[in-house]
Amino acid sequence: EEALPQITVIHKDLLEDGWQNSFEGADRVYHIAADPDVRGSARKSWEVYENNVSATVRVLEAMKEYDVKEIVFTSTSTVYGEASVIPTPETYSPMIPISIYGASKLACEAMISSYAATYGWHAWVYRFANIIGSRSTHGVIYDFVQKLRANPTELEILGDGSQSKSY
């Protein structure tokens, strides 16, 4: 944040009020807030919907209110579901998510697309796979790292080795 003084990072709960005026004078919004828990999304489907879809609509409404015409959105490769084409191109269809999380991010993409078309905005959507960071608690990369820490000479891979991913 200090290295890029022209960027304002908003550390707020997007489901609450009070952050919207931060968009005043902004040229572009980078919407990276989300509940990224694919595995846990089945247990807390309403919470995932609120934190992803409702929060995104609130961002879009604030953009409309403050006349911000560009949005960059971080989505996920889980919007593709069980893709039959590997590697999976961005134009792959139909997108049939198999997780609540993937469905919520696809709904966000649809809302962003509709707002952009309706209000003449520009939107960029990036579909990332296997995002990891210091607060990660699970996932394939996290599991690999934990297994290698436990035994640096051997990496146990689950499954029969025939699985493939688009990355």
Set out the residue ranges of the language-model regions.
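A conserved pocket-lining segment of Rossmann-fold NAD(P)-dependent short-chain dehydrogenase/reductase
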Residues: 40-41, 91-96, 123-130, 146-167
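NAD(P)H-binding glycine-rich loop region in Rossmannoid oxidoreductase-like domains
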Residues: 11-51
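Glycine-rich phosphate-binding loop and adjoining beta1-alpha1-beta2 segment
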Residues: 1-4
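Short, conserved active-site loop motifs that form the nucleotide-linked donor/cofactor pocket
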Residues: 7-8, 123
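Catalytic helix-loop patch of NAD(P)-dependent Rossmann-fold dehydrogenases
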Residues: 43-58, 65, 70, 79-125, ...
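Residue(s) in the substrate-gating loop at a strand-loop-helix junction
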Residues: 76
